Every structure is written in C-alpha cells, then in structure tokens.
Swiss-Prot record:
Protein purpose: DNA-dependent RNA polymerase catalyzes the transcription of DNA into RNA using the four ribonucleoside triphosphates as substrates.
Molecular-function annotations in GO: DNA binding; DNA-directed RNA polymerase activity; ribonucleoside binding
Reaction it catalyzes: RNA(n) + a ribonucleoside 5'-triphosphate = RNA(n+1) + diphosphate
Gene assigned in the entry: rpoB
The protein's name: DNA-directed RNA polymerase subunit beta
Natural source organism: Clostridioides difficile (strain 630)
GO cellular component annotations of the record: DNA-directed RNA polymerase complex
Family: Belongs to the RNA polymerase beta chain family.
C-alpha cells in the first residue's frame, strides 16, 4: 500500500517497499571534492616534485616553499559573467633562492598568475561563460596480461607495463616459445637482453633467477648477447638507432628511462596496482609448495613441501619478506614464482606509526636496511620519514620488472590471471583536480627550463627569485586547458537536470583517452563491473555511444580514482543484513557474493528466501544459499544515473527507449508555468537541490524579508544572510533563469532548506514539463508516425510556453580611417527606424523589436574621396562632416523578434576591461515568449517523442463523460513495437492520483506494480482496467471502444520550429565559388544537390535546370541581369557561364593543363574573368527607394563593388563572403508555419 513521505515541502504517496538505508550523497561532490583536493594537496605535490631547481653547476638552488590563494576574487560570479571576466584569485608562491657559495638565502613571494576558482555549483566562469570540466575515464597505470591463440591454437601471452607517464614495457610470446620485450614502443628483442642490461649478465645467473623453464631456454637460445655490456649496447641500438652505442650512454639512457622519477612516474595509483598485481600472496595461494618455506627471521616453517598454501599463509609468507617461492605443478614440475618485494610495514614494526600516514605496502630491502641500521623508535621513524621516496617509490624498480617477467612465465602454468581492460578495476577517473594538476605540472616543467637558463645567464650577486621565475608558461598552460581542452566544456544549462548530468559525466575521450574512430565495440559495451558505478542506460546515441557515460546515483570516487559503490554488510553469524555500509571498488567486490536490493527481507533484516539470487565472480548471476552471501545492494536506484532514476516505471521500458527518455529530459525547456510531475520517482527534490538551480539556505534562522529580488534571513546568532535572486537572466542555452521565493516572511528556516525556486523547479523539485490529460487513440490521421495532436487550450493558457533570451553585442572599434562611433545620427535612415533609440543611439529597455530593426546605431568612417572644388567650398561654408561614414548598425537578425529586457554598456572611460582596439561595447538582451505550435518537438519520459501535427480547438477535442476535453492525443500504435510500456502504467496511475489529489513517488525497480495501480484506480472510482468512454467533440457521439485515458508528464524539447524555419530570396554568396552560402546561421539558400538535379533531368525540365545551375546560383553577371529584367518587367536574358565552372578551369590550369571551351562548331568560347567596366550591365541604373521614402539613383555594379570593398576592409572578417543585392533590397519571405499541416 502507498504510504505518505515528505520530500522537501511536498508530501508524496510512495509505493516503495524497500526502506532507504542511506541518503543519496552530494551529487556534485565529484567536482567539488576533487577541486578542493587540488587546492589543498595537488598543488603542493607539483611544487614538491619540481623543487629544488638547481643550476647546471649545482651552486644556485631555487625552492618553492609555500603557496596561498587570495580569498578575495576581483569580481563576484555574476559580475564576471557580465564583464566577460574569469572568476579567479591570484596565486602567490613563497620562493627561496639559496646560493651555496656565499650561503646567502633570499625569500620572496612571487605572483604566479590568476587561478580560476570553482563556484559552489561545481562550475568555472571562464571569460564570462560558465564551463564544466568533465571527468575523464582512462586506463589505470599497472601491469596487464592478455591472452591470444595463434593459428595452431597455441596460447600466446602478451603483457604491458603502463606507467602514469614514461616509457612502456611490452612483453609478448611468439609461436616458438620465445618471450620478447619492446622498450618504449621500439622493435622487439628477447626479454633476456633487457635482464642482462639491468645487471643480470650471464645465462647461469638468469636461469638461477627465474628457474628452469623451456620458454626461458628458447629465449636464451635466440639471444645473441652474453654479458651485461652486450645487453646494454643491444638495447641502446634499438632505442637510438643510428647513434654510436657505448656502454656508458646505454646505461645512463636506461636509468633515465625507468629509474628517474622526473621521467618515469607511476603515481600513487600505479604503485598500488603494481603491488596488487605482482604481490606474491595472490599468486601462490591455493597452490602446492615444492619445498619447505621457512621464516628467515624466526626460522619457523610456514609450509612444508607438498602442502597447500592458504590465503592467510600466503599473506604471512609475503609479509615475512620472502620473495621467491617454488610451486609444484600437477605433473611434478617445479615453477618459480617471484614477487616484487613489497611488504606490509605493520608486520615488521611493532610500535605505533599512524602519524607517518603510510597506507601502502613498502619496499622490503629498504625497510630492512633501516631496521638493521637503527634500533631506537624515534630514529627509525625519522629514517622512514627521510627515505619515504625509496620505501614507496613512484617509479618502477628492478624488482617490479623481474616480477612482471616471472608473472609472464607463470601464466602458462595458470599461476596468476588474465586481465580484462574494460573492467572498472582497470579503468580510473581523472577528475578536475588531477586534470588541473597535470596542466600545472606541464607549465612548471616548462618554467623550470627557463629558470635554469636564467640562472646561468644572470649575475650571481643581483639575482632574485622574482627575476628568475617566469610565470607565463604556467598561466598559459592553465588558460589553454580551460579555454580549449576537449574536457573543458560549455555548460549545458537548458534545465537543472542537464546541468547536474553534465557535472557527473564521464568521458573516455580527450587527451590521453580514446578516440572515436579507434574505440571498438568492447570499450563501449556495458560491463558487469559498471553495476552501481556507471549507468547502463544514459549515454548519447550516435558516434559517442558508450564512450560518454554518467556516474551512478550512489557512486563515489576513491583516492586512487576508482569508482566505488556502497553495499550493506551481511553478518554471517546472525544471518542478518546489517545497516553497516561498505564502499567497494569493482575489483574488491568481485571477491564477494552480492545480493540485490529488492531481495525481500523480514523486519529484523533476515532473508525471506533461503536461496537468494546473487551476483558472484565475474558478474555471473546465480541462486546461492543465504549463508554464502557477503553483501547486499543499498538501494535499487544505485544501478542507474540521476536522469535515468527520474523515469517512473523504468523497469517496464525497453532499454533503448529508456536511453532516449533519459537523454530527452535533459533537453526539456523550462516552462513559464512550472508544475512538478504527479508521477515522480522521489529523486526530483535532491536533483534540483544539488544542481545549483535553486537557492538553498546557508544557515538556519527566520525569514525577515521576502521579495521577488531578495530574501533576508535573520540567523540564530543575530546576523543576517542576504540572498539575491536572479531575475530573467540568460542561461548558456538561451533559456530564461528566473528565481522565485517559496517561503513567506516569518517562516522558520532550517539550514539546507530550499528557499527559492529556480528555472524548471516547483517547490524545490525538478519540474521539466506539464501533467497533461492524454488518450491513446487515433484521430483523423493526425497521429501518423508519432505525430501529436494537442488542444488549443494548452496554447491559450500558456501551459507549454517558454521564454527564450538572446544576446546581441556591438563593439565600436578603432579602424585605420578613424574610430567607429555609436550614435543616433545614422546616414540614410528615416525617423521611424530610430524611434526606439535613446540619445546615445542604443535601444531602450522594453521596446518591441522585429527582424531588421536597429538595436545599436553605429557609423564607421569611409575612405576619403577626392572632392570637387564646389564640394570643398560648400563644406567650408556649412561645416559639413569632413568625412563620409557608412551605417554599420547592429540590427536584429532575420527571423528574430521580441522585447528588450536588458542593455549593458561598457566603455574605456568607465575603466571596463575591453579587448584591444575596442572603445565601447553594447550588449542587448531580447526576450521572446514562445507558445507551443505546430512543428515543435515534445516527448514523455519514456522515449516517446513526436512532433505537433495540429492544434485542435477545444470544442473539437474528444471529451470525457464529465465534459473534460483531452489535452493531447497520442498514437496507440507507437507502443507495441517500441516496448516502452512504462508510459501506459504512468497514464493509469496518473489518472487515479489526479482524482485522489495525490502526488506519487514510484521509485525505479521499487515502485507501484500493476495490482497497486488497479487498486488506486478502484479507489478513485474508475474501472480496474483504467479505460473510459470518450465522446467525439464534433458530433457528441461516444466512440465505439473504451479508451485508455490518464495523466502523463509531457515535456517540450528545445528543438523548436521557430529556430529551424528559414527562407531566403537574396543573401550572401561564397567568395570563391560565388554560390549562395548554406544554413540558417549564414542566411543561406537551400542546396539543390546531385540527386535533385537527377530528378529534374529525369523530367527533362531543361529550363528550370538551367536556371537553377546558373542565374539562381553562381552566374554572377546573369543574376544581376535577371534582377534587372524582373525589376523592369522584361524577359529573362540568356544565362552566362557559372563561376564554379571558371574555378574548375583555373584548377585544371594550375595543374598545367591547357583547357579551352569550344562550341559544337569547334569555335573557342572566351571565358571572361569578371565584369568589365564598359559592359552593358554597368549602365543599368535603378531607382532605389531609401528608408526616408526618397528616390535615389544607384548603379548596381558599383554598389556591389563598394560593398565588397567595405567587406574586405573589415578587420575581423571571419568567413569572407560578398554581400550583394541583400544590402540594397531587403526582401523576406514570410513563412507562417500554421499554414502548413504537417
């Protein structure tokens, strides 16, 4: 039975049967926490890595001691958006310069550039635009083994040792059993060559190290080197072909390649993965020992020969510092297993070392050295502190290389396991903090080079830290990252959900990731390890499918960057599921048996069924006895992302349609009249709160003042918090941001309460659409192919109206001929055109504008012309303006209109930061209310999308028995083949809930079932099948069959017909081919392509075809003459030669081919380059009526040439195109989409 639950300010009837153990974590913590880590630790790590910087003599040392970020940014967030500034704070670093010769120490605080700050909502404001840094999903550093079969079916093992940065090592086996190695992607050579180069010189030493093995013998046979020196030389030849090899250079190269922390870095995660993979204990457990294993320190026997090694013993053997174990195989063969010599420090030190903060395993030989050298506790601690970089090395060690080679040999005996690179245990997340850290590192390493050079050049005495440090490389690297990295994206701000999803997005693309073209099917596919970590539903359709994913609802990211999912612990002693929550990574969870969240439990937490459906090793789903269970899911919605969790009855939808539903919710435009869904899932409130679209109380207190613009809350300590609300601001996506208070004066407020609604929220819940009364029936064919028939009432009552705000800007620059001027005094413009401009020449707020209207009057100086004596005299007498100007005003573009809601003016005089060469900048904001109309796209939450085909008058719409007309009619045929049955259940439950006055929460995988819905329908007084009799609005007669009617939540998507409809008569042409440009943005024409030409050819419509290919396209002379003929009412003349044909001839001539055009009588046709001055069309004069209604004389060709010249003078021409008649005759075809029934 449904039970009431209070979510925020609204009570919903919940059908949930599972009690919520834990709240959803903060949904944007992946952004906020990562950036916080970067400021606290990430920056420190980079400075520690880079310092000290020494000069080439080792005399001067520069250290970065400490750093601080100023608390006070120059502008606040809103001001940054207005001024196109970056929301940032200055980074100051304390730098110490030590001169070893003189012992002099200089300290200075150095400014290291402005560092972008993250807003509370997890975004950055860069140059006035809100951006999001998307987290990247990359392959984790580590050692990976893969298996293939050759033609004969023989097992071939290949492996890769991947660092965070540095040279790769790749091992592979060929069909002759030779194991070879590639160093840093060079040509392969036997693996023994690498071992010799690393100091294990003779064959006997190598066999002694790795043990007897036929593969080793085959490899040694192929290896032509016999000593350490030969090995080094051989490696050097492959790494540096063509250079003369010497033993010294080879040795230093190999050292630099692998053992220099500056060149080779595993990072924390790489060391962790190496130790996990190469550790002895996982490889020898459950195997049989070939000899007695004795503790070297105490002499006790761990395991006798022939005994099985348990997991606990294996761990003890490893931690005792034993690194080599011989195992006995089934055929009595001995196999040697070599670990990488890392142990748990606590097994060797009996006093408390928690203050050293060592969580990882440590290198045993180094630890042994320390323990042998010191006996006092404090001394040992100090030694550990000073040698921490050797104990936990960030680069690869010889031990690691030997262990990885040993693993390669062992795998043939099934010791160790093959890795799956798509498993989330082997893929990690690089969040904002780490991505930024990498950029800063790049910047600092460039800076290091500059500092070293300056140290040698500058005078020793006068040198200061300030003079050495050049901050340009660092700030350039950061700027480049935020401005142009693939992972720094313009935030999708269509609605709160799209904003939240964007911040939780995981992308496998980007620098260091995959590319679309190379990504195969396996990488994109859903993997069993995605469960509870990445959503299997929400991913884009198209080329990025599976490469861009969304984080699971409850997922967190651990210190190594692996995604963790929460589970409830199952207590095996009491056989109950506890409320103790453990976060597990993908490879940890594989060791356990996990039950699903909707497995029925008794009141005291015991399983109802004794056999439980569980996920076991490698994601297999089995029925297991309850005693085998280790963990249980925490919530059914942990599997999916936030957007998917907002689809009610998700479990009844086909996955393909659910994917579309999740993606289309992100495209819903915020409505003027918002309404929360009647059928929700209960996560709406949390999504809105964490997205940052609503205003949340920072502290508890009492509301003292509540107006449309601000809320003031008096805190318990007597201070006041002021919240300024945003009114009619433009979002990144051109939708309207408007915040309205939802509390009253005198209300008691608790910290964390939502106190004001934002766009597309209602009482703090995400409200993307409207609850509409829907019937599934056909109506006169207007439902064909998913089309939607809507009631005119939705238009009249503004139920689906949205406000869109567009921004236009105009800048007055300095030109070569003088500065441009913003003014009301525009040449050749009538009073009617400037009636809405103020005395500065800028449109007033509140004016209604249409396309072509002037927003900002601006004039640009024109080139000085030679004046006649008379004109000079007149100018001298009347003091006329000495220079000619032309009108370059900002006009409303084609097809746009609306009301001016805001105008912002920035000038040099007021001290505003403007880009070079700009004296004044004006921004106008035009708001347009768009009602729903034919051609707009709408959708439900189940992937059921369609286009509006007709708006039917209210009286013609079918109506229910009580006289209520329907809002929307949908096609019932759209359901069976698409299998999104969730929409039908939503409609039925919606009908009952609306009648009973409920708001419902039906969570995913834990919501209402069909019997709950039938009971609710019955309670509301409807038949149990939810079908009702409808009556035809035109005749009043009832329809033959009963029809499914109910309430569905319907969204209006941002694919609006107004933004897509476009028509052109004349307009801009492309510069080279002289063909009309394409696309609405360029005010282009419709392309008449190859196939359309075939259609006309098939009809034999020769004249139309000729016109389309010449005078309507790129026959420059012909199109002017045609214009002339139309204006004068004469016959249209013969077409000339198209410009693109001339271009083709030029292309052929550029290949030294002499091309002539001949008639059928072999007479050569002269292809003219351009219009000559004395051509007849040059004499065509045309009366042009200007804006003032006066008749001017005008020569078309000159006008065209002038226009072209002016265009060429503009400094910032982006796409060079010639504007022709468009400037003279402004013609427009008015398309009213209501005339077309689609």
């Amino acid at each position: 039975m449904p039970h009431p639950v209070t979510i925020g300010k609204r009570t919903r009837m919940s059908f949930s049967k599972i009690k919520e153990i834990a709240d959803v974590p903060n949904l944007i913590e992946i952004q906020v926490d990562s950036y916080e880590w970067f400021l606290k630790e990430g920056l420190k790590e980079v400075f520690d890595d880079i310092s000290p910087i020494e000069d080439y003599t080792g005399n001067l040392i520069l250290e970065f001691v400490d750093y601080s970020l100023d608390d006070k940014p120059k502008y606040d967030i809103e001001e940054c958006k207005e001024r196109d500034a970056t929301y940032c704070a200055p980074l100051k670093v304390k730098v110490r310069l030590i001169n070893k010769e003189t012992g002099e120490i200089k300290e200075q605080e150095v400014f290291m550039g402005d560092f972008p700050l993250m807003t509370e909502r997890g975004t950055f404001v860069i140059n006035g635009a809100e951006r999001v840094i998307v987290s990247q999903l990359v392959r984790s550093p580590g050692v990976y083994y893969a298996e293939e079969r050759d033609k004969t079916g023989k097992r071939l093992i290949s492996s890769t040792v991947i660092p965070n940065r540095g040279a790769w090592l790749e091992y592979e086996t060929d069909s002759n059993d030779v194991i070879s190695v590639r160093v840093d992607r060079t040509r392969k050579q036997p693996v023994t060559v690498l071992l010799r180069a690393l100091g294990i010189g003779t064959d006997a030493e190598i066999i002694d190290l790795l043990g007897e093995d036929e593969r080793l013998s085959a490899t040694l046979e192929k290896d032509n080197t016999k000593t350490v020196e030969e090995g080094l030389v051989e490696i050097y030849k492959k790494l540096r072909p063509g250079e003369p090899p010497t033993v010294e250079s080879a040795s230093s190269l190999l050292n630099a390649l692998f053992f220099d922390p500056k060149r080779y870095d595993l990072a924390k995660v790489g060391r962790y993965k190496f130790n996990k993979k190469l550790a002895l204990c996982y490889r020898i457990m459950n195997k049989i020992s070939a000899e007695d294993i004795i503790n070297p320190e105490t002499g006790e026997v761990f395991v006798k020969a022939g005994e099985k090694i348990s997991y606990d013993l294996a761990k003890a053997i490893q931690n005792a510092g034993i690194n080599v174990v011989n195992l006995l195989m089934d055929d009595d063969k001995k196999v040697r297993v070599i670990g990488n010599n890392f142990v748990d420090i606590k097994s060797h030190i009996d006093f408390d070392i928690d203050d050293l903060n060592i969580k990882e395993k440590v290198h045993y030989p180094t630890l042994k050295e320390i323990l042998d050298g010191y006996s006092d506790e404090e001394e040992i601690k100090e030694a550990i502190k000073s040698r921490i970089k050797e104990l936990i090395p960030k680069h690869i060690l010889l031990d690691d290389i030997i262990a990885s080679i040993s693993y390669e040999f062992n795998i043939f005996y099934n010791i160790g396991n093959i890795d799956d690179i798509d498993h989330l245990g082997n893929r990690r997340i690089r969040s904002v903090g780490e991505l930024l850290q990498n950029q800063v590192r790049i910047g600092l390493s460039r800076m290091e080079r500059v500092i070293k050079e300056r140290m040698t050049v500058q005078d020793m005495e006068a040198i200061t830290p300030q003079a050495l440090v050049n901050i340009r490389p660092v700030s350039a690297a950061i700027k480049e990252f935020f401005g142009s990295s693939q992972l720094s994206q313009f935030m999708d701000q269509t609605n709160p959900l799209s904003e939240l999803t964007h911040k939780r997005r995981l992308s496998a693309l980007g620098p260091g990731g995959l590319s679309r073209e190379r990504a195969g099917f396996e990488v994109r596919d859903v993997h069993h390890s995605h469960y509870g970590r990445m959503c299997p539903i929400e991913t884009p359709e198209g080329p990025n499918i599976g490469l861009i994913n969304s984080l699971g609802t409850y997922a967190k990211i651990n210190e190594f960057g692996f995604i963790e999912s929460p589970y409830r612990k199952f207590d095996k002693e009491t056989s109950t599921v506890t409320d103790e929550i453990h976060y597990l990574t993908a490879d940890e969870e594989d060791l356990f048996v996990r039950a699903q969240a909707n497995e029925p439990l008794t009141e005291d937490g015991k399983f109802v069924n004794h056999r439980v459906v569980c996920r076991t090793v490698n994601g297999a789903v089995e029925m297991v006895p309850e005693s085998r269970v280790d963990y249980m899911d925490i919530s059914p919605k942990q599997v999916v992302s936030v957007a998917t969790a907002m689809i009610p009855f998700l479990e009844n939808d086909d996955a393909n349609r659910a994917l579309m539903g999740a993606n289309m919710q992100r495209q819903a435009v915020p409505l003027v009249r918002r309404e929360a869904p009647i059928i929700g899932t209960g996560i709406e409130y949390r999504a809105a709160k964490d997205s940052g679209a609503v205003v949340v109380a920072r502290n508890s207190g009492i509301a003292e003042r509540v107006t449309a613009d601000e809320i003031i809350i008096k805190r318990e300590d007597g201070n006041r918090d002021r919240y300024n609300l945003l009114k009619f601001k433009r979002s990144n996506s051109g939708t309207c941001i408007n915040q309205t208070p939802i509390i009253n004066k005198g209300d008691q407020i608790i910290k964390g309460d939502v106190i004001a609604d934002g766009p597309a929220t209602d009482l703090g819940e995400v409200a993307l659409g409207r609850n509409c009364l829907i019937a599934f029936m056909t109506w006169e064919g207007y439902n064909y192919e998913d089309a939607i028939l809507i009631n005119e009432r939705l238009v009249k009552e503004d139920r689906l109206s949205t406000i869109h705000i567009e921004e236009y800007e105009c800048e007055a620059r300095d030109t070569k001929l003088g500065p441009e001027e913003i003014t009301r005094d525009i040449p050749n413009v009538g009073d009617s055109a400037i009636k809405n401009l103020d005395d500065r020449g800028i449109i007033r707020i509140g004016a209604e504008v249409d396309s072509g209207d002037i927003l900002v009057g601006k004039v640009t100086p024109k080139g000085e012309t030679e004046l006649t004596a008379e004109e000079r005299l007149l100018r001298a007498i009347f003091g006329e303006k000495a220079r000619e100007v032309r009108d370059t005003s900002l006009k409303v573009p084609h097809g746009e209109s609306g009301i001016i809601v805001d105008v912002k003016v920035f000038t040099r005089e007021n001290g505003d930061d403007l880009s070079p060469g700009v004296n004044e900048l004006v921004r106008c904001y035009i708001a347009k209310k768009r009602k729903i109309k034919v051609g707009d796209k709408m959708a439900g939450r189940h992937g059921n999308k369609g286009v509006i085909s007709r708006v039917l008058p209210e009286e013609d719409m079918p109506f229910m028995e009580n006289g209520t007309p329907l809002d929307i009619i949908l096609n019932p045929q759209g359901i069976p083949s698409r299998m999104n049955i969730g929409q039908v259940l939503e409609v039925h439950l919606g009908l009952a809930a609306k009648t009973l006055g409920w708001y419902v929460a039906t969570s995913v995988f834990d919501g209402a079932n069909e019997y709950d819905i039938m009971d609710a329908l019955e309670e509301a007084g409807y038949p149990r099948d939810g079908k009702l009799t409808l009556y035809d609005g035109r005749t009043g007669e009832s329809f033959d069959n009963r029809i499914t009617v109910g309430y569905m939540y319907y969204l209006k998507l941002h694919h609006l017909v107004d933004e897509k409809l476009h028509a052109r008569s004349t307009g801009p042409y492309s510069l080279v081919t002289q063909q009309p440009l394409g696309g609405k943005a360029q005010f282009g024409g419709q392309r008449f392509g190859e196939m359309e030409v075939w259609a006309l050819e098939a009809y034999g419509a020769a004249h139309i075809l000729q016109e389309i290919l010449t005078v309507k396209s790129d026959d420059v002379v012909g199109r002017v003459r045609t214009y002339e003929a139309i204006v004068k009412g004469e016959n249209i003349p013969e077409p000339g030669i198209p410009e693109s044909f001339k271009v083709l001839i030029k292309e052929l001539q550029s290949l030294c081919l002499d091309v002539k055009v001949l008639t059928d009588e072999d007479q050569e046709i002269e292809v003219r380059e351009s219009v000559d001055e004395d051509d007849t069309i040059g004499e065509f004069e045309l009366d042009v009526v200007n804006h003032m209604g006066e008749v001017e004389e005008s020569n078309i060709i000159e006008e065209i040439e002038d226009d072209f010249a002016e265009n060429a003078e503009d400094e910032d021409i982006e796409n060079l195109e010639e504007f022709t008649e468009d400037d003279l005759f402004e013609e427009e075809i008015d398309f009213d989409s209501d005339d077309f029934d689609m």
